[in-house]
Structures are given as structure tokens and as C-alpha cells.
């Protein structure tokens, strides 16, 4: 907003202030001049112990250059300037803010996160135009009541402070859409929060909440509710009536039972990991028709209801670390991209099937549905034929599972007789794991028109031959626990590959060719020596939802990685970088990505 300087704010002695007293830390005049033109001033990361007076008075005092140059052109007239609307003074050492803050009434954005503030000035009430206020990562113990006077405020970030309570009158922030109170010391949430009728996103994670007010259900526009890492033992049944809710986070609490969700027909993600839930019934699932992500890991579930198969939109299901002994075969009819089952006492699915990943488990479950539909009392008994090489191949397994299995033989070569035995049979899966293979069998190319997944883990492969790159229908490739340090460029022809496991190899850089395989959904490259990743290229991998970089040599995580919003699971533990801190990593992928985005240079 360009305007002439208003008379009441003009100080005729302004040009002499600097000579009369110490003005404190200085700001380059070039920055101030640019700010008068653009209306924006960024002083982040300048080691400031206080805000220079010239910042507060940027639209009041006569600029220094006005005293030095009296022949202004029409584009340099100091009195025809822009009010400061955006002020960023984050990542400094500020312990307090002056009441002179009131001299910037046009501010719409004030970012003072990552300082040492213990309080906010009462003059903040005079910032009538303020729309976004970021005071996160400070040392605030209380909030001034004056903050509730900011009627135009839309975004308020207060995470990572020391707040124990919320001032009365918060409900007056009628325009507020995004409120982050995570990582404080709150024990209660005022019932009046329900009057925040415009709120779309509410983050209460990492506090000390033992319950939520039932009135929270009156937030009819709320889409994102995060209550992770609290002390919740129950959730008000009224939460199930929140019609606009899309994301609900309740991880790391003390929940034993779940509410029903009769009106949550927009709910896309339900995160319930690390609770004490013992039962999941049809009543909990029947209304979740839009659900994409269901995270139940680390609970005490003993069974999975058949009704889970009704969730036809479900893409990611995490049931790991429960007490589940069997799965309903109907799960095989789901269109899952990710299914986690580790840490369960499953008796009906072999470990090697689970190790091969989601699609193999679903395929196995579907095969069991067929078995159930046809009486197996007179089925063909499992038979085997002996090859001249003394290898044994299960003909029944090849015919029914379409699996060519020559695993755990400690073999250095795959016998030709094994390939000969499959000439008249459709093979979609190959398992040559746990051998001593130094190269990929050349005859694997004979199956290029049919094979979808290959397991070559636990061998001695030091390179990938071109034969593998010809299997263009491949969707799953397991190469973990080999001696690989690079991948050939020809692998870019694997245009249907969805999952690749490269863990426990010798990679020092993230394989460049993987950036060009746009179909990849999961890249597992933990326990290598990877020193860097390219966030710009990673962002172009639009289908990538799982990236495991644990236990590598990453000295820093580029902030731009936070722009890879397609990631649902990002694992970074066990690397030598210092930031993000372990506390951030523990909060999960969404928190890590947000942390990184906040540190992208303006």
C-alpha cells in the first residue's frame, strides 16, 4: 500500500535522533531502503539481541539518505513509501519486544520464531491488520490477553514454548484458521475453543492433555486435528460428528477404546499408533468411506474385522507391533500401496511372504479366498520333481502361486533345469534370495513378459546386469544385503517399478537413476553410506510416499526436502546430522517436513 507520510506520525527532529542517543544494533541502510519500497523486511539469523529502533520507526523517521541527497528523483521520494506489512526477525536472540511495535500498524505478517522471548508486549493489540503471527520456539509461559484483540488474525503459531494455559477471550479470534499449540505444557483446552468457528487446523500435540472438551465437536469447519503425544485415555464421542474432519492424529496416548465416526465421511487419515487399543470393530470402520491412511501400529489388537475390506479407498494400513495372529483373506481385495505387519505373531502367513512386501501379501490373501471358495478336500497334493542338478522345484507352488523359488540354497548359480521347468507356466514372482550369487542369472530375461517382483536379497551382487533392466513389468525389486555401490542408467526403463529395497549395501550417493523412475512409491536405502540427496529431484518423484534413509552418512538434511509433501513416511534416524533434532524426528514425517519447510531461506 503506497501512500504519503501521515502528518500525525511525522517527527521534524527525526533526522537528528541518531546523533542524540545510541540507537542500538544497526541495520544496513540498503535493507531499510528496500523495505520502504517493498513493505517487507527480513532480519532473520542476524544474532540480534534486540530489535533496532530504526526498524520500529522505519515509516516514521526521515531516512538517512534523505539528509545526504536532496535531489531525489521521482522514484526515490522518501515521503512516498510503502508501509511495512511483513517483518521477519526469527532465529535471533531476542528476549523481549518493545511497545514501539505499535509504530507498525500496517503489519500483516510478524515472524519472531526461534528467539528467547518470555513475553509479548501489550502493544500487540494495536496491530489491527495482523493476519499471521509466528512466535514458535521461544520461552513464553503466558500469553497477554491483548492477543485476543487481533480480530483479523488467521494464522497463530505458538508451538515449542512453555505455555500452561490459554487466556480468556481466545474465542474472539473469529478469523483464525490455523492454530498450533503443540509442544507446550497445556493440561486443559478451554471449552470456548468451540467458538473458533473459522478454524481449519488445530495442533495440540505434545502437551499434557488428559481429555478433550466435548464442545470441540462444534468446530464444524475443522479439517486437521492433531492430539499426538498427550495423556488422553478417551476421546469424546462427539468427535465422530465432525463432518469436515479430514486428518485426525491421536498417536502416543493412552487410548483403550475408539469412538465411532458416524459423520466423519471426509476423514482421509486416522493415526492411532502407540496406544492401548484392544479391539477394532465393524462399528469403528463402517462410516470411513473416504479413508486413505489407517495407522494402528503399536497397540494391543488381537484381530482384524472382516469389515476392513469395505474400506475400498484405503491405501496405507499399518498393523505392525500388535498381537494379531491371523488376517481376514478379504484384505486381499483392498487396493493397498502399503501394508505393515511386522511384530505380530502371525501364523497364517509365512515370514518370507511378508518380507516381500505389500503386493505379495495381498496376492497371497487373494489366493486364499479362491481356496476357500473351492473345496480343497480333493485338491491336488503338493508334489515335487527332482532335477538333474538335485534342485527341487515345487510344481504345485509354481502352478498356484506363480512363484519360482530357489532361495536359501547357498548356491552360486541357478540351475538351467529350473528355468526349463517353467517354460509352460506363467511366473510372476522370483525368489533367489539367500544364496551366493555374484551376478544375476542371464536366463531371467526369458521371463521378462510376466515377472512382477524379484527377490535377490542376501547374495553377493556387486553390479546389476542389463538383463534385469529388460523386465519392464517389474513392480517390486528386493536387492538388500548385497555389495552394490551403484545402479545402471538402464534401470530407468523399469517404468512400472513401485518398490525398491537397497538396504545394507555400499551406496555412497543416492542412485541418480531412481530420480527418473516416476512410478516409485517406496525407496528403502537404509544402512548404506549415502551422504546427500537432491531435494529438487526428489520433489519430482510425485508418487514417492516412503523414503527410508536410516543409518547413512547424512551430515545435513536440506530444508528443501520439506517441499516433498508427497512423502508419508520419511525415516532419518541413525545419521550424523544435528538438525532436525531427535525430538522432531520422533514426532513423525509430517512434523519433520514442516520443520524443514520453516527453515527454507526466504
Curated annotation (Swiss-Prot):
In its keyword annotation, does this UniProt entry include Repeat? yes
**Positions of post-translational Phosphoserine modification:** 71
Q: Which SUPFAM superfamilies match?
A: L domain-like
- Intrachain S-S bonds: none
PROSITE patterns found in the cross-reference section: LRR
Question: One Pfam family, short name please?
Answer: LRR_8
Task: Cite the residue spans of the region called Disordered.
Answer: 1-26
Repeat among keywords: yes
Q: Residue spans with biased composition (Basic and acidic residues)?
A: 8-24
Q: Which UniProt keywords apply?
A: Leucine-rich repeat, Phosphoprotein, Repeat
Name-wise, this protein is: Leucine-rich repeat-containing protein 40
Task: Please name the taxonomic classification of the source.
Answer: Eukaryota, Metazoa, Chordata, Craniata, Vertebrata
Q: Where are the LRR repeats?
A: 35-58, 81-103, 104-126, 127-149, 150-172, 174-195, 196-219, 221-241, 242-266, 268-287, 288-310, 311-334, 336-356, 398-421, 424-447, 449-470, 471-494, 496-517, 519-540, 541-564, 566-587
Amino acid at each position: 500500500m503506497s501512500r504519503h507520510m501521515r502528518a500525525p506520525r511525522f517527527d521534524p527532529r527525526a533526522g537528528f535522533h541518531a546523533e542524540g542517543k545510541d540507537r542500538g544494533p544497526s541495520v544496513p541502510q540498503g535493507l531499510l531502503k528496500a523495505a520502504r519500497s517493498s513493505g517487507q523486511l527480513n532480519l532473520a539469523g542476524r544474532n540480534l539481541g534486540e530489535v533496532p529502533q530504526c526498524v520500529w520507526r522505519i515509516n516514521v523517521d526521515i531516512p538517512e539518505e534523505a539528509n545526504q541527497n536532496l535531489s531525489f528523483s521521482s522514484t526515490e521520494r522518501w515521503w512516498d513509501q510503502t508501509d511495512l506489512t511483513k517483518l521477519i526477525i526469527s532465529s535471533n536472540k531476542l528476549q523481549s519486544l518493545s511497545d514501539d511495535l505499535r509504530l507498525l500498524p500496517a503489519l500483516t505478517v510478524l515472524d519472531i520464531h526461534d528467539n528467547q522471548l518470555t513475553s509479548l508486549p501489550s502493544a500487540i493489540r494495536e496491530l489491527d491488520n495482523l493476519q499471521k503471527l509466528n512466535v514458535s520456539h521461544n520461552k513464553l509461559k503466558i500469553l497477554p490477553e491483548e492477543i485476543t484483540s487481533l480480530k483479523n488474525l488467521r494464522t497463530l503459531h505458538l508451538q515449542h514454548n512453555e505455555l500452561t494455559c490459554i487466556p480468556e477471550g481466545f474465542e474472539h479470534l473469529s478469523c483464525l484458521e490455523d492454530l498450533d499449540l503443540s509442544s507446550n505444557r497445556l493440561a486443559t483446552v478451554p471449552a470456548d475453543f468451540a467458538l473458533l468457528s473459522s478454524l481449519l487446523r488445530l495442533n495440540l500435540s505434545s502437551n499434557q492433555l488428559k481429555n478433550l472438551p466435548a464442545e470441540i465437536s462444534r468446530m464444524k469447519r475443522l479439517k486437521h486435528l492433531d492430539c499426538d503425544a498427550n495423556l488422553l485415555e478417551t476421546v469424546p464421542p462427539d468427535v465422530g460428528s465432525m463432518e469436515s474432519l479430514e486428518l485426525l492424529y491421536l498417536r502416543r496416548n493412552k487410548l483403550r477404546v475408539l469412538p465411532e465416526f458416524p459423520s466423519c465421511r471426509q476423514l482421509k487419515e486416522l493415526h492411532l499408533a502407540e496406544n492401548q487399543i484392544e479391539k477394532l470393530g465393524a462399528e469403528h470402520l463402517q462410516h470411513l468411506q473416504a479413508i486413505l491412511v489407517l495407522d494402528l501400529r503399536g497397540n494391543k489388537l488381537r484381530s482384524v474385522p472382516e469389515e476392513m475390506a469395505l474400506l475400498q479407498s484405503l491405501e496405507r494400513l499399518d498393523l505392525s507391533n500388535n498381537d494379531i495372529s491371523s488376517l481376514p483373506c478379504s484384505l486381499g481385495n483392498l487396493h493397498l500401496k502399503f501394508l505393515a505387519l511386522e511384530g505380530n505373531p502371525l501364523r497364517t502367513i509365512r515370514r518370507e511372504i511378508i518380507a516381500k512386501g505389500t503386493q505379495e501379501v495381498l496376492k497371497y490373501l487373494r489366493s486364499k479366498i479362491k481356496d476357500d471358495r473351492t473345496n480343497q478336500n480333493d485338491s491336488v497334493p503338493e508334489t515335487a520333481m527332482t532335477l538333474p542338478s538335485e534342485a527341487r522345484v515345487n510344481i504345485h507352488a509354481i502352478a498356484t502361486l506363480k512363484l519360482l523359488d530357489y532361495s536359501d540354497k547357498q548356491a552360486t548359480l541357478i540351475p538351467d533345469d529350473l528355468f526349463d521347468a517353467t517354460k509352460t507356466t506363467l511366473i510372476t514372482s522370483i525368489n533367489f534370495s539367500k544364496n551366493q550369487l555374484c551376478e544375476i542369472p542371464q536366463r531371467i530375461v526369458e521371463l521378462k513378459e510376466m515377472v512382477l517382483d524379484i527377490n535377490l536379497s542376501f547374495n553377493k551382487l556387486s553390479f546389476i546386469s542389463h538383463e534385469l533392466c529388460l523386465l519392464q513389468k517389474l513392480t517390486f525389486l528386493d536387492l538388500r544385503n548385497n555389495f552394490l555401490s551403484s545402479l545402471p542408467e538402464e534401470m530407468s526403463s523399469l517404468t512400472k517399478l513401485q518398490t525398491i529395497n537397497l538396504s545394507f549395501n555400499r551406496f555412497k550417493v543416492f542412485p541418480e537413476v531412481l530420480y527418473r523412475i516416476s512410478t516409485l512409491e517406496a525407496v528403502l536405502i537404509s544402512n548404506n553410506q549415502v551422504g546427500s540427496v537432491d531435494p529438487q529431484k526428489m520433489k519430482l518423484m510425485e508418487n514417492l510416499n516412503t523414503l527410508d534413509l536410516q543409518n547413512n552418512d547424512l551430515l545435513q538434511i536440506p530444508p528443501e526436502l520439506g517441499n516433498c509433501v508427497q512423502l508419508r513416511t520419511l525415516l532419518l534416524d541413525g545419521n550424523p546430522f544435528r538438525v532436525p533434532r531427535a525430538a522432531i524426528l520422533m514426532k513423525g514425517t509430517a512434523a519433520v517436513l514442516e520443520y524443514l519447510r520453516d527453515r527454507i531461506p526466504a
